């Protein structure tokens, strides 16, 4: 399995090689096509160019055991991915999120990279702890790097009032709020 490319980017593609007994190949292909239709329908508005395909490999891939495959899938399903919490103070602002940005299974080694962002430090730590616990319970070694402090926006700051007024004078309309969050990276092996 090879999905995503960078820990600070939403994955855009993934490939996976699986071993299937010849007697089950027709059923696996049919189920793949069924799931592909479901996924494409679910994401048609936000990812209209999603492409999912199945093809036969030129050679037999090196495989991991079924039990390890199930452990990996179950653990990935437990790891927060996407919006974790919206801001209770600023409408429409994502307060915290996590991106499972990279998953790689190669040479019998499982590696993931994820990135947590939050304007609230304790919430970022909560997401990081949840991810750590999920992967450590599977027996993985978890390394946390690239921690940046959370920064909670102050919608009532003096500079914001001045900048809003200046924007209104220049453009004769109200500005739209924009905020950035800070990051914590995870690598799991």
Residue ranges and their predicted role:
Residues 1-117:
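Midchain, well-structured core segments that form catalytic/ion-binding scaffolds
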Residues 27-30, 34-41, 74, 78, ...:
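Charged/polar, solvent-exposed surface patches and flexible loops
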Residues 97, 101-178:
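Substrate-recognition/cap regions that form aromatic- and gly/pro-loop-enriched pockets
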Residues 181-188:
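Conserved small/polar residues in nucleotide/adenosyl-binding loops
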